[in-house]
Amino acid sequence: MPRPKIARQICGRPANSCFKPNGRPMHQLEQVALAADEFEALRLVDLEGMQQQEAAVVMGVSRQTLANILKKARYKVVDCLSQGKALMMQASDPDTSGDIPL
């Protein structure tokens, strides 16, 4: 049985629920889901310029957990950009909390 997820602090939200290549209908695209905690980790580290340790404290997780979240998120973003897939932003799940609901 996997270990239960620690509640994560999610304070930012994406401007859109989906990013996809121009000129292709959504039904023709493979979709990749980006979880709320993955978006938040990318936002804090890559956009806000926080160190991983600082971002981990903000999200309420360990630095290693944040690094694992970032690795998954970056893989998904690069996969979508290089393969022409749609990147779908998921709403926050019950294991997250924050100031702004997704």
From Swiss-Prot:
Pfam families: DUF134. This is UPF0251 protein ASA_1331. InterPro entries: RNA_pol_sigma_r3/r4-like (IPR013324), UPF0251 (IPR002852), WH-like_DNA-bd_sf (IPR036388). SUPFAM superfamilies: Sigma3 and sigma4 domains of RNA polymerase sigma factors. PANTHER family: PTHR37478, UPF0251 PROTEIN TK0562. Disulfide bonds: none annotated. Belongs to the UPF0251 family.
